């Protein structure tokens, strides 16, 4: 995209691609022949990183994206770092809606240790929390249950586990990955974000 006017000329061609291996945006440049002086590359990267902080769907940070600066144009007099930063903003705003972005939610790996008599209650509870049972192991009258559950579903879990097991259950959790939100939930969050922005 280009920003025009006296003292503000910058033109960039940026390719955006999924990058599931990295949460933070990965920036590369593949500009050949001096179409853009190297001194402007950091401004393009900064502009893109600023945009990634607030996604287009509901304002959440954009993750798992690789941005590659492929080409562009500059002007000896009218180009500046600010012009290339603004051009990066425009490229992002133009490309992101076309990329079919989705909302993601953090998934945690949960390990629960409970007396065997509570296993059915725990499994039923995990099902209500949109959890996936990954494994179970019985040891000394205790069931070790491993599940992966959306973090949003784990609020107040310590209190609820204590109530379900009469204080005899324990658990640990750690971040595992991000997964796409179910469509109905995603639509609700996007609608709420639009409503909040209009207020």
Q: What residues fall within each predicted segment?
A:
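Accessory interaction regions appended to the cores of large information-processing enzymes
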Residues: 1-199
């Amino acid at each position: 995209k280009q920003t025009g006017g006296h003292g503000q000329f910058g033109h960039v061609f940026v390719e955006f691609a999924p990058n599931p291996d990295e949460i933070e945006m990965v920036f590369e440049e593949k500009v050949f022949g001096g179409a853009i002086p190297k001194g402007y590359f950091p401004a393009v990267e900064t502009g893109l990183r600023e945009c990634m902080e607030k996604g287009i769907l509901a304002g959440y940070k954009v993750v798992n994206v690789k941005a590659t600066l492929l080409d562009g144009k500059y002007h000896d007099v009218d180009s500046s770092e600010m012009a290339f930063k603004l051009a990066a903003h425009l490229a992002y705003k133009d490309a992101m809606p076309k990329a079919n972005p989705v909302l993601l939610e953090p998934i945690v790996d949960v390990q629960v240790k409970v007396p065997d008599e509570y296993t059915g209650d725990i499994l039923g509870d995990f099902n209500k929390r949109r959890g996936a049972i990954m494994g179970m192991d019985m040891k000394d009258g205790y069931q070790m249950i491993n599940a992966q559950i959306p973090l949003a579903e784990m609020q107040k879990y310590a209190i609820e586990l204590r109530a379900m097991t009469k204080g005899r259950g324990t658990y640990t959790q750690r971040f595992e990955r991000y997964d796409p939100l179910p469509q109905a939930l995603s639509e609700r969050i996007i609608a709420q974000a639009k409503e909040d922005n209009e207020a």
